[in-house]
A protein has these predicted regions:
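Sec-dependent signal peptide recognition
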Residues: 1-7
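N-terminal signal peptide c-region/cleavage motif recognized by signal peptidases
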Residues: 14-15
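Acidic Gly/Asp/Thr-rich repetitive segments characteristic of extracellular carbohydrate-active
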Residues: 19-41
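Extracellular beta-strand repeat scaffolds in secreted/surface proteins
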Residues: 40-44, 165
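Generic short beta-strand segments
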Residues: 45-49, 253
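Extracellular beta-strand-rich solenoid/capping regions of secreted or surface-exposed proteins
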Residues: 49-63, 71-90, 95-110, 125-127, ...
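All-beta strand scaffolds that present successive hydrophobic residues in beta-strands
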Residues: 62-66, 86-91, 111-118, 136-143, ...
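Glycine-centered low-complexity coil/loop motifs and glycine-rich tracts
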Residues: 70-78, 92-104, 117-129, 141-154, ...
Length: 272
């Protein structure tokens, strides 16, 4: 009986070990990423610098485990997740990625987890780090000095669904709305975020220095300090949070958040 248990355990461990493949070069990462069949986990074992866009995964289900290694995008675009795909991004340190929408990840499919350290990523449109029109279960990590020309300096939820956003958001900025996070509706599709909880420090935008919402947001909790809404030709809204939709619950510590407009600021420094 013991022998049989050990054999079964050995098979189980072998199968789980075989489910991951390790890569240590950009070429290796892209080759594994594009395969239509293969292991479900790609483990990155060394720091990397990109010479081109990462692009879309070839197979329907994939997890990227960064192993805490740094991936420098060198101003190239990150991952693209298509409809019907399952994708997770774990233990990553990603910087200097840039795209039209979602510098690091543009998600139209389903993502279980996004976590890691994300810094100095950008979008010419919205979503300096993450642009979502699909489903994401959990976003957690450190987001610092990311930028979007339009909205969502770190995270832009465009009619999609996100269960949880957490972490530390420092000095992210957007040219329009949501210095760190923007949750918006599109046509008849309501953007929905169940909860946002984190530390928001020194983020900035014209409306919602830290968070902008015109869709549905369940709860917002955390620490908000030194966030700023500033508009050169219009009225700034909500130094910390600007809400033009539905937020069910807001609680936290608010200090030093400001709203400064070309004329009257709307909603004051903390919440509009």
């Amino acid at each position: 009986m013991l022998r049989m248990v050990l054999i079964v355990l050995g098979i189980f461990l072998f199968q789980n070990k075989a489910a991951a493949v390790s890569v240590d070069t950009e070429e290796g990462l892209k080759a594994e990423l594009q395969k239509e069949e293969g292991d479900n986990v790609i483990e990155i074992s060394k720091n990397m610098e990109m010479s081109g866009d990462l692009g879309k995964a070839g197979r329907p289900s994939l997890t990227i485990d960064g192993g805490g290694n740094l991936i420098d995008g060198k101003s190239h675009a990150g991952f693209s997740v298509g409809k019907g795909q399952d994708f997770s991004l774990l233990n990553t340190e990603m910087q200097n990625f840039s795209a039209l929408f979602g510098g690091v990840v543009n998600n139209q499919g389903k993502m279980e987890t996004v976590n890691g350290d994300f810094s100095v990523n950008s979008a010419k449109g919205s979503g300096g780090v993450i642009y979502n029109t699909g489903e994401i279960n959990q976003i957690n990590g450190s987001f610092e000095q990311n930028f979007a020309d339009k909205s969502g300096g770190a995270v832009y939820n465009n009619g999609g669904t996100i269960e949880e956003i957490g972490g530390t958001f420092v000095e992210n900025s957007a040219g329009d709305k949501g210095g760190a996070v923007a949750n918006v509706k599109v046509l008849f599709k309501q953007g929905n975020i169940a909860s946002v909880n984190g530390t928001f420090d020194g983020n900035s935008a014209e409306a919602g220095g830290a968070i902008y919402n015109n869709a549905t947001l369940g709860s917002v909790t955390g620490t908000f300090s030194g966030n700023r809404a500033a508009a050169e030709y219009d009225a700034a809204q909500g130094g910390a949070i600007a809400n033009e939709g539905q937020i069910d619950f807001v609680s936290g510590t608010f200090s030093g958040n400001v709203a400064e407009g070309a004329y009257q600021a709307q909603g004051g420094g903390h919440l509009s």
